[in-house]
Amino acid sequence: PIIANVTGGVSGPAVLPIGLAAVYHTRTVLPDIPIIGLGGIDSGEKALEYLYAGANAVEVGAAALFDPVAPLRVARELDDLLDSRPELAAKLAAGQTWR
């Protein structure tokens, strides 16, 4: 296939494990910087994985291309997950999940 910009990219679900590892390793080396987790987030559970790995915030990218309301759905799902697990919400608020 012909690729317009000569390089190809990887996005969506295939990036999730790479993104999670990058967030975790960055957090262990630089514990005080803000980190935005992105790559493969199409559900509240996957957003929670990034937060648990050490991200301060998450971004929904490719999923929004296929479903424009995906960011709102993911936020709602994440909110529901945290409401159902107050102990996890407290750990996230204290920055203790990735340790």
Mark where each language-model region is.
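Glycine-rich phosphate-binding active-site loops on the catalytic face of alpha/beta enzymes
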Residues: 40-41, 46-74
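Active-site-adjacent beta->alpha loops and helix N-cap segments on the catalytic face
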Residues: 11-24, 45, 66-77
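Glycine- and other small-residue-rich loops at beta-strand/loop junctions that grip anionic moieties
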Residues: 11-15, 36-40, 63
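Alpha-helical structural signal in soluble globular domains
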Residues: 25, 29, 53, 73, ...
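Conserved, mostly hydrophobic/aromatic
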Residues: 26, 50, 89
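Glycine/Thr-rich beta-alpha phosphate-binding loop at enzyme active sites
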Residues: 1-33
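Glycine-rich adenosine-cofactor-binding loop
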Residues: 27, 33-45
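Extended, intrinsically disordered, low-complexity segments
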Residues: 16, 72, 76-99
